[in-house]
Amino acid sequence: MSDDEFIDTGLFAEPEGFTPPPPPPHFAKYQRKNKTDPAELNLRLVGKSPLWGHLLWNAGVFTADYLDKHADELVTGKDVLELGAAAGLPSLICGINKCNRVVCTDYPDPDLISNIQHNFDHCQGLDLSKTVVKGFIWGADAKPLMDDSEKEIQNEDKFDLVILSDLVFNHTEHLKLLKTCRDTVKKNGKCLVVFSPHRPKLLENDLEFFRTCEDFQFKAEKIDLVTWKPMFEEDDESIDIRARVYSFFLVPQW
């Protein structure tokens, strides 16, 4: 009898319906450029997410840098909303820079939301009483983001700044994103929109967001276009385009 006859080849097979556990969370360090305290933020990222919340993207870093640099104008004493926050880095920077309140949102996936809350709970220099972390679906009723009471929302209940960092690649969601911006930003506020072209062939679809915004009574004002090290250097296709980081303000015209 051969040795093979004694081997149960199904011994280590996964049972039917088995789902492997998700990868464990990992950490990424963000270094503030202005060297003020805290000089470094240690961000926990989810192990894996179909919503791409497991990566610290260039657009998020650029957004954080920009808000830190222009905090006196955009952040300090202001009401701030972030959409699609992933690890919540821009919101954390707003909190550290003494915003009046920051509401940090992402898709209501429990892993994503609990991970953002973890980063808030472990961030040095943050006044948690002025922060809210919650799930939100773009285009939905935005009133719960601003006020939980029954009163009608007024301009003063809305946000001075709405942050959209690396969201415009969701081309099917442009109208919902813009509706939420229209519903939540103050007449004298603005939206900060930052993105990198992850799919170079669809760059024009990304940029369509800044034309469509006019239908919602916004004017797009370009802030900057910089070139950074791309996220995935092993992908040689159109590396010069993927290295770009675009930034715009959407300014209300109503």
From Swiss-Prot:
Keywords: Cytoplasm, Methyltransferase, S-adenosyl-L-methionine, Transferase
Example GO biological process: methylation
Main localization (coarse): cytoplasm
Subcellular location: Cytoplasm
CDD domains noted in UniProt: AdoMet_MTases
UniProt cross-references to Pfam families, sorted A to Z: Methyltransf_16
GO CC annotation terms, alphabetical: cytoplasm
InterPro entries: EFM7, Methyltransf_16, SAM-dependent_MTases_sf
Entry-linked PROSITE patterns: SAM_MT_NNT1
EC class (word): transferase
An example Gene Ontology molecular-function term: N-terminal protein N-methyltransferase activity
Residues noted as binding S-adenosyl-L-methionine in the record, renumbered to the chain: W57, G84, A85, A86, D106, W138, S165
Superkingdom of origin: Eukaryota
EC id: 2.1.1.-
Coiled-coil stretches noted in the UniProt entry, renumbered to this chain: none
Task of the protein: S-adenosyl-L-methionine-dependent protein methyltransferase that trimethylates the N-terminal glycine 'Gly-2' of elongation factor 1-alpha, before also catalyzing the mono- and dimethylation of 'Lys-3'.
Family: Belongs to the class I-like SAM-binding methyltransferase superfamily. EFM7 family.
Name this protein carries in UniProt: Protein N-terminal and lysine N-methyltransferase EFM7
UniProt source species: Debaryomyces hansenii (strain ATCC 36239 / CBS 767 / BCRC 21394 / JCM 1990 / NBRC 0083 / IGC 2968) (Yeast)
